[in-house]
Amino acid sequence: MSLFEDLINAKIKELEDLKKNLLIDVETKIRKEAEAVVNKSLERIATVESETLLEREKILYDAVVESRKMIAETYESLLQDLINSIYNEIERMRGSERYINFLSRLLENAVTYIQSKEVVIYASPKDRGVVETLARKLGLSGLIAERDMKGGVVVASKDGSIVVDYSIESIIANKVEEIKHLLYEMTYER
């Protein structure tokens, strides 16, 4: 072989090596770019999935909050309806023996608590006559005055230092938690 052939063969080998390395470099570069595009797409997909999951959780949370609010409003409405029905029943019973006995027990309990028969009694204008009769029957002395209330009585010591509020409104207010519990039990027993 001649020097010329050796140079040509060396250049051919050099070109073949360059071609081989160029293909490997191009293939590696394309693979890296493809992996970068795939990774970026996977990141976008993960972000969209995460945002979708967060949105779903927010929608579920909002729905739960709204349903609890509606349940609370329904219970409040039921409670108010029940209280109004109690007031209506008191109005219907007014003057009956059962209601008169109820007022009598309230007066007796109040006088026992105050420990005096000299008292000031407040009653609904609709109950004043019955309360006057009961006060005489129980030997109570003092003033009987009218007060805007649904029923029951408010009894105070003569000097006003002790007040026993047995108005229907106060009795119901003291029983609201018990009434709520009963409503809850009635609703969930079914």
Curated annotation (Swiss-Prot):
Membrane topology: Peripheral membrane protein
Gene3D superfamilies reported for this sequence: ATP synthase, E subunit, C-terminal (3.30.2320.30)
Official protein name in the record: A-type ATP synthase subunit E
Keyword Membrane: yes
Location within or outside the cell: Cell membrane
GO biological process: proton motive force-driven plasma membrane ATP synthesis
Gene Ontology CC terms: plasma membrane; proton-transporting two-sector ATPase complex, catalytic domain
Source organism (scientific name): Pyrobaculum calidifontis (strain DSM 21063 / JCM 11548 / VA1)
Pfam family, one: vATP-synt_E
Assembly information from the UniProt record: Has multiple subunits with at least A(3), B(3), C, D, E, F, H, I and proteolipid K(x).
GO molecular function per UniProt: ATP binding; proton-transporting ATP synthase activity, rotational mechanism; proton-transporting ATPase activity, rotational mechanism
Major localization listed first in the record, in broad terms: membrane
